[in-house]
Curated annotation (Swiss-Prot):
Hydroxyproline PTM positions: P137
PANTHER family named among the record's database cross-references: ORMDL PROTEINS (PTHR12665)
Any single biological process term in GO: ceramide metabolic process
Cysteine disulfide partners in this protein: none
Organism lineage string: Eukaryota, Metazoa, Chordata, Craniata, Vertebrata
Protein name: ORM1-like protein 3
Quaternary structure and interacting proteins, as annotated: Ceramide-sensitive subunit of the serine palmitoyltransferase (SPT) complex, which is also composed of SPTLC1, SPTLC2/3 and SPTSSA/B.
Domain notes: Ceramides bind to ORMDL3 N-terminus and stabilize it in a conformation that physically restricts the accessibility of the substrates to their binding sites in the serine palmitoyltransferase (SPT) complex, hence inhibiting SPT catalytic activity. In the absence of ceramides, the N-terminus is flexible and permits substrate binding, thus liberating SPT from inhibition.
Species name: Danio rerio (Zebrafish)
Length: 153
C-alpha cells in the first residue's frame, strides 16, 4: 500500500517520456545548452557543436543507461530495481514513439555537428564514438544485457 501517492502507474518511470510537452522541453534544453556554450568567449563554433553533442550524449548515457531503479517506492516487488531507465520506459516495449524520439535525437544532433564542424577528422571521430556509445545500448538486442558485468548490480 502506497500512502500519499497521487499517480496511478505502478512505476511512473515507464510513462514520463510520454508526458505533455516533454519532447519540446527536451529539444529546447539542447538548444539552451548550445546557446550557453556559444556565449563562452574564445571558443570556436566547431568546438561548441562538438561540446554540445558530447555533453548531450554523456547526460543521455548516464540518465538512461547507467542509473537504475526508480526514485519512487513502487509496489512492483523490486522489479524496477535492476532495470535502467531505458529498460523501464514504456514497460519495456520496443519501438514506441518515445524510444524512437530518443534514438533519432542524437542522430540528428550528430548530423548537425558533423555539418557545422565541416567534417573535420578529429571532431568526426570524437562525435562518432560518442554517438555509438549512446546508440548501441538502445538496440533491442541489448535489453537487460550488462557487458563485462558493468552495472550488473
Amino acid at each position: 500500500m502506497n500512502v500519499g501517492t497521487a499517480h496511478s502507474e505502478v512505476n511512473p518511470n515507464t510513462r514520463v517520456m510520454n508526458s505533455r510537452g516533454i519532447w519540446l522541453s527536451y529539444v529546447l534544453g539542447i538548444g539552451l545548452l548550445h546557446i550557453i556554450l556559444l556565449s563562452i568567449p574564445f571558443v570556436s563554433v566547431p568546438v561548441v557543436w562538438t561540446l554540445t553533442n558530447l555533453i548531450h550524449n554523456m547526460c543521455m548515457y548516464i540518465f538512461l543507461h547507467t542509473v537504475k531503479g526508480t526514485p519512487f517506492e513502487t509496489p512492483d516487488q523490486g522489479k524496477a530495481r535492476l532495470l535502467t531507465h531505458w529498460e523501464q520506459m514504456d514497460y519495456g516495449v520496443q519501438f514506441t514513439a518515445s524510444r524512437k524520439f530518443l534514438t533519432i535525437t542524437p542522430i540528428i544532433l550528430y548530423f548537425l555537428t558533423s555539418f557545422y564542424t565541416k567534417y573535420d577528422r578529429v571532431h568526426f571521430v570524437i562525435n562518432t564514438i560518442s554517438l555509438l556509445t549512446v546508440l548501441i545500448p538502445k538496440l533491442p538486442q541489448f535489453h537487460g544485457v550488462r557487458l563485462f558485468g558493468i552495472n550488473k548490480y
